[in-house]
């Protein structure tokens, strides 16, 4: 007969108890009442937070946006085709966040920071909340360093500083994206990290931008966040916040960043779609009441940090599309009131061959000359004044038949100055080249040339100055001032090049 030893049994029981490690935890769950159009209504989820991530049975993730008395409105981050009525949903206890690291540079990702360029996973040890509070008043300092775009019209008359928010606004097909991509190209060697966020764009347009950046070697300091037109509205709404979180990661590490939102009209439309499907009351143009807050909390994250926080910066260039030049629509007026100025692109100028088609008259920068180097201030003031007078005169000259010689000269000068502002796409100019170009125009050196010869002469002058008078560039880059010595060098170069140019044209 087998004897039962009590100590053995107690040892076995003790071992089993020690091995038992099943965790007891409370899971907040709910049931799907209704699903469709990227929205799910959930019964239950009693303790869910606003903005919390929830997980459906088949793996889809959603965000709890509407917390009502008897159900929860969830927006889906996917098509949700496999979700069925009655299936279970559990709250994750997390707010939307993304991984962040240096490894994102040069990659194309979606709104959930997953790579979509087919080049493998991205390693990241840290994460940041997609929606994080903007820096407070004490954490900021006023904008004082220039962020050069490489476009004469902007850098001389509508300057942008590091930490500023400057809106690019205009009709479709007026070159808004071109201005933004040229600005990215011009950051080469400036130690600025660029983030380009494409919201609701055609996939072919995004591919074109990425190709341009790759060909020009700009992808190594750029991250592209893309949610194309066929993406769910939730992801189009989230994409700008994902871009901002990535830019903030670098900003708080004492780096300078530039972020482009292309474009916020599409984000507002995606948010309107979500809100209407969630049955939130519509307001003006059927947008929900909090559409202003949608953009203000995004754009307020752009800042120039104080010296205590390392003086990093995040410069935002949001893009907004207008319908036939109507700047007084809801989204344009909202974003104009949030930003520190706007660059207005006109379809009429674009069609007249003036590209970039910047309407200097109604474009402003509320930071102004604080975001310019001294040398640019010295030459740009005169350009602004002469162009403003030219626009007035041109309107007047349409009605007057006989104009005196002085007026004719002023009109001729204005036409050449307008010609000088024209630039090819993807050909940004350095500050030194811009200063030289503006000085040549405002001091009458182009007056004797035909309008058709102006651009050719300026291109040749830039090459001549670079090869024969390299000291000019050195003086301006080291002193940031247009000194008498620099002026003398420039005058000599203009005279010499003009003589050569006249002989060439005669031949």
Swiss-Prot record:
For this UniProt entry, the molecular function terms from Gene Ontology, in alphabetical order, are:
ATP binding; proton-transporting ATP synthase activity, rotational mechanism
Tell me where in or outside the cell this protein is found: Plastid, Chloroplast thylakoid membrane
Q: Which UniProt keywords apply?
A: ATP synthesis, ATP-binding, CF(1), Chloroplast, Hydrogen ion transport, Ion transport, Membrane, Nucleotide-binding, Plastid, Thylakoid, Translocase, Transport
ATP-binding as UniProt keyword: yes
According to its UniProt record, where is this protein mainly located? Answer: plastid
UniProt-annotated site: Required for activity, residues? 363
Residues recorded as binding ATP, renumbered to this chain, are: 170-177
A GO term from the CC aspect: proton-transporting ATP synthase complex
| Lipid bilayer topology | Peripheral membrane protein
Enzyme class, broadest EC rank: translocase
Reactions this protein catalyses:
ATP + H2O + 4 H(+)(in) = ADP + phosphate + 5 H(+)(out)
What family classification does the UniProt entry report for this protein? Belongs to the ATPase alpha/beta chains family.
Q: Which PANTHER family match?
A: ATP SYNTHASE SUBUNIT ALPHA, MITOCHONDRIAL
Q: How does it assemble?
A: F-type ATPases have 2 components, CF(1) - the catalytic core - and CF(0) - the membrane proton channel. CF(1) has five subunits: alpha(3), beta(3), gamma(1), delta(1), epsilon(1). CF(0) has four main subunits: a, b, b' and c.
From the Swiss-Prot or TrEMBL record, give the protein name.
ATP synthase subunit alpha, chloroplastic
Query: Lineage of this protein's species?
Result: Eukaryota, Viridiplantae, Streptophyta, Embryophyta, Tracheophyta
The gene that this protein is the product of is atpA
């Amino acid at each position: 007969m087998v004897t039962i030893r009590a100590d053995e049994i107690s040892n076995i029981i003790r071992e089993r108890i020690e091995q038992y490690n099943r965790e007891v935890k409370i899971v907040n769950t709910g049931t799907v009442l209704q699903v469709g159009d990227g929205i799910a209504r959930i019964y239950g989820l009693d303790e869910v937070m606003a903005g919390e991530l929830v997980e459906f049975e088949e793996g889809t993730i959603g965000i709890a946006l509407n917390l009502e008395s008897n159900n929860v409105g969830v927006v889906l981050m996917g098509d949700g085709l496999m979700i069925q009525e009655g299936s279970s949903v559990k709250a994750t206890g997390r707010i939307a966040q993304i991984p962040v690291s240096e490894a994102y540079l040069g990659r194309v990702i979606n709104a959930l920071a997953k790579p979509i360029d087919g080049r493998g996973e991205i390693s990241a040890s840290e994460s940041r909340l997609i929606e994080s509070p903007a820096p407070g008043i004490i954490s900021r300092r006023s904008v004082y360093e220039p962020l050069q775009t490489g476009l004469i019209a902007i850098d001389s008359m509508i300057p942008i500083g590091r930490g500023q928010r400057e809106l690019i606004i205009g009709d479709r097909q007026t070159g808004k994206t071109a201005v933004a991509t040229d600005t990215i190209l011009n950051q080469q060697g400036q130690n600025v990290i660029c983030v380009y966020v494409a919201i609701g764009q055609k996939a072919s347009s995004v591919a074109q931008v990425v190709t341009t950046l790759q060909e020009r070697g700009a992808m190594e300091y750029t991250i592209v966040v893309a949610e194309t037109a066929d993406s769910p509205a939730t992801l189009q709404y989230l994409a700008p916040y994902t871009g901002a979180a990535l830019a903030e990661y670098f900003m708080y590490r004492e780096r300078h960043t530039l972020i482009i939102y292309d474009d916020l009209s599409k984000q507002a439309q995606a948010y309107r779609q979500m809100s209407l499907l969630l049955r939130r009351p519509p307001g003006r143009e059927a947008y929900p009441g909090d559409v202003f807050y949608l953009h203000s909390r995004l754009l307020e994250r752009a800042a120039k940090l104080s010296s205590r926080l390392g003086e990093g910066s995040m410069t935002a260039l949001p893009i907004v599309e207008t319908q036939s030049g109507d700047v007084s629509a809801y989204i344009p007026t909202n974003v104009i009131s949030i930003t520190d100025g706007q660059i207005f692109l006109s379809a009429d100028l674009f069609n007249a061959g003036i590209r970039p088609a910047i309407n200097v008259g109604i474009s402003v920068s509320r930071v102004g000359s604080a975001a310019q180097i001294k040398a640019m201030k010295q030459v740009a003031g005169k350009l602004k004044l002469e162009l403003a007078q030219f626009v007035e005169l041109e309107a007047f000259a349409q009605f007057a038949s006989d104009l005196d010689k002085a007026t004719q000269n002023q009109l001729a000068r204005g036409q050449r100055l307008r010609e000088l502002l024209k630039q090819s796409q993807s050909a940004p100019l350095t500050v030194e080249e811009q200063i030289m170009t503006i000085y040549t125009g405002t001091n009458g050196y182009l007056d004797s040339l035909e309008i058709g010869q102006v651009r050719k002469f300026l291109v040749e002058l830039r090459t001549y100055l670079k090869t024969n008078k390299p000291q000019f560039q050195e003086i301006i880059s080291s002193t940031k001032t247009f000194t008498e010595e620099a002026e003398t060098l420039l005058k000599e170069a203009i005279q010499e090049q003009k003589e050569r140019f006249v002989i060439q044209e005669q031949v």
